[in-house]
Design a protein with these regions (language model features):
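Short aromatic-glycine-(Arg/Gly/Cys) micro-motifs in beta-strand/loop hairpins
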Residues: 7-20
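A short, exposed loop/beta-hairpin motif centered on an aromatic-Gly-Thr core
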Residues: 22-33
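Short, charged, surface-exposed hinge/linker loops at domain edges
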Residues: 1-3, 32, 36-67
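Short amphipathic alpha-helical segments
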Residues: 2, 20-23
């Protein structure tokens, strides 16, 4: 399962970071927008890694949003 951490920045934007995929993070005007963008980016990164024969994190599910 990929874990997402979500925080509100000082400027009001939201950032969602995928803990299990270092460097994968996305901003949004709302919390939900940041989460959806991070999920979409994560799926692209995982597909790219699989396509190139790279390892991906072991997952029992897909996403868990952490408080």
């Amino acid at each position: 399962m990929l874990r997402l951490e979500v925080e509100r920045e000082d400027d009001g934007r939201w950032i969602a970071e995928v803990v299990d995929l270092p460097g994968v993070q996305a901003y949004g005007a709302t919390r939900q927008e940041a989460i959806e963008r991070a999920k979409a980016l994560s799926l692209r990164v995982l597909a790219d890694r699989l396509e190139h024969g790279e390892t991906v994190p072991e997952m029992g599910g897909v996403f868990a949003v952490l408080p």
